[in-house]
Design a protein with these regions (language model features):
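Thiamine diphosphate
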Residues: 1-268, ...
Length: 268
C-alpha cells in the first residue's frame, strides 16, 4: 500500500492493501508483516501448521519487542501479530507425516501472558467471531488454528459469538445430562477433536443411553490456565463448576497432550 503521491512515471503502486501470495518463505512473509504492522496498519500471516515452526525465533523476538515497546511512553500501540494456521496435523491425507507438527502452540505457551493468545475455533462461525475479535486487538500475538476444508457448522452466528466471548463452555445441546450431575466429562479443543467428541457422544447415546455425559468445548485455550497466571484464565471456582471436581475428564485436544497437562495440573 503506497500512502504518498503517485506520479506518472510510477509503476505497480496502489493505495489499497494487497494479498502477498505464493511466497514460499515464512521468513519473508513474517518479516514483511512485522514491518507492515510497524506502519500502524493491520494484517495477518497464513501458513501451514507444520511449517510455521520456521519462524519460531522471529515470533519470539516480536514478543520481546512488544514487551519493551510497551515500556516506552511515546510508543503507540500496534495492531496484533495475527497468525492463522491451516493444513493442520489432523487433515493430512495426502502429505502425511511430514506435515504433522502442532508444536507451535507449545512454542507460544511459555511467553508473557499479557502478549499471547491461542484460539481453536471449531466451525465457520466460531472462526469468523474469533477473527473479528483478534483483528481489533493491540499488542498481542494471536494464534488461530483452523481447518480450510468443508466442516460441519455447529453454531449459529449468535451462538458462536456468545461461545467465543466465554472462550470455554458446555455444549448443552450435545450433553446428555438433562441438568443432572454428569458421570463423565468429554472436553475438546480444535475442529477435528470436537468432531470426534461429538461422534463419540452419538455412539455412547446409542450404546449406553443411561450414561450422563457433559460436553465442554474450548475455543480460547488460555481459559484453562489459572486466572492468577493469565488474564483470560478461569478462577478455580469457575473451573470446578464447569469441569466438576470428582468426575473423570477425557480431553480430546488438537495438539500435544502435555499442553493440557501444563495448563491444568494445578486444578482440582
Amino acid at each position: 500500500k503506497w500512502n504518498t503521491k503517485i506520479i506518472k512515471q510510477d509503476e505497480l503502486l496502489g493505495r489499497n492493501g494487497r494479498v502477498i501470495d505464493s511466497i514460499l518463505s515464512e521468513h519473508a512473509c513474517e518479516g514483511m508483516l512485522e514491518g507492515y504492522l510497524l506502519t500502524g496498519r493491520h494484517g495477518f500471516i497464513h501458513s501451514y501448521e507444520a511449517f510455521v515452526r520456521i519462524i519460531d525465533s522471529m515470533v519470539s523476538q516480536h514478543a520481546k519487542w512488544i514487551k519493551m515497546a510497551k515500556e516506552i511512553p511515546w510508543r503507540k500501540e500496534l495492531s496484533s501479530l495475527n497468525i492463522l494456521l491451516t493444513s493442520h496435523c489432523w487433515q493430512q491425507d495426502h502429505n502425511g507425516f511430514t506435515h504433522q507438527d502442532p508444536g507451535f502452540i507449545n512454542h507460544l505457551l511459555p511467553k508473557k501472558s499479557d502478549t499471547i493468545r491461542i484460539y481453536l475455533p471449531f466451525d465457520t462461525n466460531t472462526l469468523i467471531s474469533t477473527f473479528d475479535h483478534i483483528s481489533r486487538t493491540k499488542n498481542y500475538i494471536n494464534l488461530v488454528v483452523a481447518s480450510k476444508h468443508m466442516r460441519p457448522q455447529w453454531l449459529t452466528m449468535e451462538e458462536a459469538i456468545k461461545h467465543c466471548t466465554k472462550g470455554v463452555d458446555e455444549l448443552s445441546w450435545a450433553s446428555t445430562t438433562n441438568g443432572k450431575t454428569p458421570d463423565v466429562v468429554l472436553a475438546c479443543a480444535g475442529d477435528t477433536p470436537t468432531l470426534e467428541v461429538l461422534a463419540a457422544v452419538s455412539i455412547l447415546k446409542e450404546k449406553k443411553p443411561e450414561l450422563k455425559i457433559k460436553v465442554i468445548n474450548v475455543v480460547d485455550l488460555m481459559k484453562l490456565e489459572s486466572n492468577d497466571k493469565h488474564p483470560h484464565g478461569l478462577t478455580d471456582k469457575e473451573y470446578d463448576k464447569l469441569f466438576t471436581t470428582n468426575k473423570p475428564i477425557l480431553f480430546a485436544f488438537h495438539g500435544y497432550p502435555n499442553v493440557i497437562h501444563e495448563l491444568t495440573y494445578n486444578r482440582t
